[in-house]
From Swiss-Prot:
One of its GO terms (biological process) is endosome to lysosome transport. Zn(2+) 2 binds at residues 175, 178, 204, 207. CDD domains: FYVE_PKHF2, PH_Phafin2-like. Residues 35-131 form the PH domain. It comes from Danio rerio (Zebrafish). It is a peripheral membrane protein. This is Pleckstrin homology domain-containing family F member 2. It comes from the Eukaryota. Zn(2+) 1 binds at residues 158, 161, 183, 186.
Amino acid sequence: MVDRLANSEANSKRIGVVEACFGTAGQPLAIPGRVLIGEGVLTKLCRKRPKARQFFLFNDILVYGNIVIQKKKYNKQHIIPLESVTIDTVEDEGELRNGWLIKTPTKSFAVYAATATEKSEWMSHINKCVSDLLEKSGKSPTGEHAAVWVPDSEATVCMRCQKMKFTPVNRRHHCRKCGFVVCGPCSEKKFLLPSQSSKPVRVCEFCYKQLSTGATLPPRSDSYSRQGSDFGSNNISDDDDDDDSSD
């Protein structure tokens, strides 16, 4: 079905509408063989709080952006090659329901759908697209993924030393390797993580020692408590993942 739609006029028009919604600041999306599979609003668990984002699933990429005017204008376009994507379900917890992790070597994050059916459909379509791409290319699934960042609201004290309380002066930082929220003294070191950046990035003391010695880092569970997260319907925001990329 995807091959049949690839060169159809209807598919070209749908992709053209998406390009127009992102405007000149967005990347061109129409290329031979690309098909728009589906779209919808998902709630992305960002560093500061959950935020509504518009997602577009193509047969080879996943695109998302900030909602400026619903179905008319989006900005801060992000494009994720599906070949590098792995997804895992997230258990329901409080108001955070119907979620899953989108994991890539560069960046990983959690998203939440409005219903269990919507979640199932998204995960099924993403898995099918990834599977088809890997089969065509003969490549193997990506082995290593960037850590999912623990939201700021989940840590009132440093997750490494368990002592430093966060204040306007004692700022929160994120380790790029484990995703923990850590204090300045516990994250003074930097280490080169080629999949994330061409320059050394901030890592916590624990991860720095493990990386420096070549030791295997223990896997981190992403089912941490998220109590108190603001998960209302008023999270449409014109700021975005700048707060995910800052320290």
